[in-house]
């Protein structure tokens, strides 16, 4: 993605649940769907005016077959896979080891872009909670500061 912001989401019981966000200079894709050429269950929605560089599977395969580009494209693919794996591991670990409030506090430290650019209801679902729960957590955190 050259510019903009997107969210990844799933539809569960008729409700869309945000699972991830991507911003400038990040790879945007259902990577599994791209590699396996199968339909994805993940929706990707642009939330701002977004500019993308589109690479089709066929073009990707042609670059891999090119003696000049193959090693660079293989490295690119490895880096993308590593990025996805690290993000996935961090996300799973946060749901296993942290409370919703701890996940929000972590987001305050490391996810400023998400907090500044995304609507609260998407952030709530990203944290695995309802918008009402997020509001309560934010109030608890801000109360000591206000008093």
Put a short name on every predicted segment.
Residues 5-9, 51-52:
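Short beta-strand segments in beta-sandwich/barrel cores
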Residues 73, 77-80, 84, 100:
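Hydrophobic/aromatic residues within well-ordered alpha-helical segments
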Residues 18-78:
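Cyclic-nucleotide recognition modules
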Residues 1-7, 24-25:
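Glycine- and acidic-residue-biased ligand/ion/polar-headgroup-sensing regions
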Residues 98-147:
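Phosphate-/nucleic-acid-contacting segments
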């Amino acid at each position: 993605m050259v510019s903009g912001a997107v969210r990844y989401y799933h539809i569960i019981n008729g409700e869309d649940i945000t699972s991830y966000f991507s911003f400038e200079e990040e790879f945007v894709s259902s990577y599994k769907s791209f590699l396996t050429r199968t339909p994805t269950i993940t929706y990707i929605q642009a939330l701002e005016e977004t500019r993308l560089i589109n690479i089709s599977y066929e073009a990707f395969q042609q670059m891999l077959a090119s003696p000049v580009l193959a090693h660079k494209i293989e490295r690119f693919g490895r880096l993308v896979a590593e990025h996805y794996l690290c993000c996935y591991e961090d996300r799973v670990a946060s749901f296993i080891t942290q409370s919703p409030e701890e996940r929000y506090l972590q987001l305050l430290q490391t996810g400023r872009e998400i907090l500044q650019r995304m609507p609260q209801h998407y952030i709530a679902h990203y944290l695995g909670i309802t918008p009402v729960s997020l509001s309560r957590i934010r109030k608890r955190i801000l109360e000591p500061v206000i008093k």
